[in-house]
Amino acid sequence: LARTREYVDVLRRAFAREEHLRNDGEFWPLPYTGDGSTGLGKPLKVMTHPLRADLPIFLGAEGPKNVTQTCEIADGWLPLYYSPWRPEVYADQIAHRNEGFEIAVNVSLKVTDDVEAALLPVRASLGFYIGGMGAKGQNFHTQLMARMRFESEALHIQDLLLEGRRAEAIAAVPAASPDEITRLGPPHRLRPRPPPPPP
């Protein structure tokens, strides 16, 4: 959290071009004077003149504390997996977002009659992230799926992937999960639809 906060502060100051940039923070020292430096660095001002000094900063955040901080320090949020049918997952985190704060959801869209085939790469990605992108007991994607009420499925997927059973892990991804975060299928299926029943 502190690293991200300092990073955003450095970016905002760089974009503003009001100073030769110096940062004495813990994570992003400018100029760098640590191991391997020549000691000759000096504060610089960004040479480019942005069209506006307040360039919007969007952050990808997933954990509750990260999302809360993103709503405080950034201009927008890039959620990884966001289901419009489960607004409660991030309701507390985004409740006090700044005015004008944007949520930019990345949604896969494909018009096709073969829904299962279209969902397969999404299931594969979910299976890999839920099961293998993190340590057992500390995987932010597994934790997110648990908050989305897929906890037992997420833990099972993680067990399978960590045992090297990737195909089974992908097959274990509940159908509702990839279906809620994408718009895949024939035209009638892409229209707004009621939320699925809870698992």
Per-region residue spans from a language model:
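Active-site-adjacent structural elements that line small-molecule/cofactor binding pockets in enzymes
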Residues: 1-199
